[in-house]
Amino acid sequence: MAEGFVANGQWIGPEEAEELVDFEIATQMNEEGPLNPGINPFRVPGITKQEKQEYCSTMQPKLQALRNEIQEVKLEEGNAGKFRRARFLRYSDETILSLIYLFIGYFRYLVDRKRFGSLRHDIDIEAPQEECYNNKEKGMTENIKYGKRCLVGTAALYLILAIGIIIIIRTTDAQVVWRLPPLVVPVEESEIIFWDCWAPEEPACQDFLGAMIHLKASTNISNTEGPTLGNWAREIWATLFKKATRQCRRGRIWKRWNETITGPIGCANNTCYNISVIVPDYQCYIDRVDTWLQGKVNISLCLTGGKMLYNKETKQLSYCTDPLQIPLINYTFGPNQTCMWNISQIQDPEIPKCGWWNQQAYYNNCKWERTDVKFQCQRTQSQPGSWIRAISSWKQGNRWEWRPDFESERVKVSLQCNSTRNLTFAMRSSGDYGEITGAWIEFGCHRNKSIRHNAARFRIRCRWNEGDNNSLIDTCGETQNVSGANPVDCTMYANKMYNCSLQDGFTMKVDDLIMHFNMTKAVEMYNIAGNWSCMSDLPTEWGYMNCNCTNDTSNNNTRKMKCPKENGILRNWYNPVAGLRQSLEKYQVVKQPDYLLVPEEVMEYKPRRKRAAIHVMLALATVLSMAGAGTGATAIGMVTQYHQVLATQQEAIEKVTEALKITNLRLVTLEHQVLVIGLKVEAMEKFLYTAFAMQELGCNQNQFFCKVPPELWRRYNMTINQTIWNHGNITLGEWYNQTKDLQKKFYGIIMDIEQNNVQGKKGLQQLQKWEDWVGWIGNIPQYLKGLLGSIVGIGLGILLLILCLPTLVDCIRNCIHKILGYTVIAMPEVDGEEIQPQMELRRNGRQCGMSEKEEE
């Protein structure tokens, strides 16, 4: 500065004025200053010296104040004044912008790196020496303040999002009970099984429809093998027979007597039989039992009440068995005949004892053989009789009938039959609860329809080698002089004609009662007059037991009957109960597990829709488990209609009610209350399995059974992978026990409703109290959703304010500076040399064009 100005200390020239104005503008360049700090008039482009002089005169007081302000500040390295503050602000802004430009540039490089090519040059740029500023110099700027707020807000936002994700995940896991569960489990000991029969257009079975028998299973949930239908063959058989002959036993009794039949050595070894014989009306037999005699009625046994059948051979689940051919009387040939000759090997009391009291031979090593034999019979008219055209009394339809004089008992329907192969029968002890003389065989024979005869089936008995001595029992074998035995040849030779007859009666033992059916007048209705023939039509799955015969050499003191041949066919004492049991052994009685299987598809629904879907499946399973399979509405058909389910709990109730109306289920008041309870207390109610899982295995509502993957069946006793209890450290038995406790609580509410009031007022009040106590649990997701939404909205607003406002302010400020052409000028460095004040003032004075006199 000029020496004259320093000495005077009052006048400031254009050169000094320009620096002072720069200082003023620089001091205003901070975050607290105005958006437009102003311009330096001495730096306006095109300004003249005259104009600068005028500015000096006009701004002299302001310039004097600025000079005094500068003189008050010590310009040292440790205190750079407001110029140092300005440089800090400028450098901080440039640092932020540099980071932004670096991020944008690197992002652009990642997007277009393929277009840039593989050649890259790394350039080392020396980092400039930066000034260091302490916290006191930095102070609390707007950038620092908003940066801290941004950090806190962002951390809070991520924390809230993490909490929300955890809540959603935990809620989803609670609804997934078991992703790979057993489809069925064995029934337990205390359970009652309801069963029914099903045969299309069969009067005996239709009459039986609706009747139920209570059966108990002796098994535990931990057992891998549960009871089979064969365990209840006796009950099933007795019920079927009694049901089929119910009207017969109510009809007119022809004859009744009691008799005791003893063996050759008295009643030793339980060889006595107490017989009470009832002869019912033959008309009943024609209507109800005729076709059953030939074993041609296909009957399926069905389980109700939520029980199912697992076929251990085909690995299939079903509600009913395959069609079964169940004959009501003894047959030489029958399905899976199981008679054993050696009494010592028989453990099951239901298996008939085929031993004989006076034989040395015994049969063992029996093998089942299918029937590969045919019997052909023909009849030639031999008895007198008349042909008339009449309407049958037992069937409304015109047909030919032969009406001889039955009262004279002179009529005997005789036939000649032959076999297609040699059949050697084993020894016997007795016939159909009575003695049949000679060698014998019984079989069914089918007559085709012709011009004079309609189609019919007959029961034919062939006998040969009948002895004359009635005191001796005709016995298969060749050994002579056996006490009480008449040896006969029991081989039926192929293509040899034997004299046979239509069976005119039979006896049937039901429990301890032996019933005799007189078929004399029933045979009349077959239209047997004239010449006709028939052919045996044994089912392909029927057969006989072919056994080896061995002579017992342990006791030679008494002469006994020896083996007639090396092999023999077991024929006597075919037990229909044993045959039925063996047909039913492959069906294991199982039940549906006590939980709800949620398919993976449902788990992908939105939370509200997912809860509604589970509600619907729970309600359907609850009602269907009470209704059972006998109503015609299977769980498969009902659940599959609603697996794309519904929105709210109320809508779920309406849809379930509609489904029940469609399937004609009687929805009484109590059942409706159970349905509503099932929806409201699913948190404490047992989870029910539905046939929804079957659909996942490829079933639909039109299928009555479906395949079960073997690996699922084998793993039904496995340890649960993940449950809502104990993170999977629980066995199936423990799972079942826990669900049983919940089930008891659920049924406790139902029993309270049933015992206190038909309308269930008290039970519903308790249920409403329970709902009031725990109702807020169901609203937690809704509350969390609203709270989370509000927090997220506020957080995003704060975040946008923190991030955008400072950047926007700086952007506007920089843009205005660029437009106005303003550039920040840093304070010039002060030299350490001492400046002569007089010379500096004089220089400045001459620059302003003043003389020394004017200066004085």
From Swiss-Prot:
Which keywords describe this protein according to UniProt?
Cleavage on pair of basic residues, Coiled coil, Disulfide bond, Glycoprotein, Host cell membrane, Host membrane, Host-virus interaction, Membrane, Transmembrane, Transmembrane helix, Viral attachment to host cell, Viral envelope protein, Virion, Virus entry into host cell
Q: Does the keyword Transmembrane apply?
A: yes
Q: Which Pfam families match?
A: Env-gp36
Any one GO BP annotation for this protein: symbiont entry into host cell
List GO terms (cellular component aspect).
Answer: host cell plasma membrane; membrane; viral envelope; virion membrane
Give the protein's biological function.
The surface protein (SU) attaches the virus to the host cell by binding to its receptor. This interaction triggers the refolding of the transmembrane protein (TM) and is thought to activate its fusogenic potential by unmasking its fusion peptide. Fusion occurs at the host cell plasma membrane. The transmembrane protein (TM) acts as a class I viral fusion protein. Under the current model, the protein has at least 3 conformational states: pre-fusion native state, pre-hairpin intermediate state, and post-fusion hairpin state. During viral and target cell membrane fusion, the coiled coil regions (heptad repeats) assume a trimer-of-hairpins structure, positioning the fusion peptide in close proximity to the C-terminal region of the ectodomain. The formation of this structure appears to drive apposition and subsequent fusion of viral and target cell membranes.
Q: What is this protein called?
A: Envelope glycoprotein gp150
Organism listed in the record: Feline immunodeficiency virus (strain UT-113)
Taxonomic placement: Viruses, Riboviria, Pararnavirae, Artverviricota, Revtraviricetes
Identify the coding gene: env
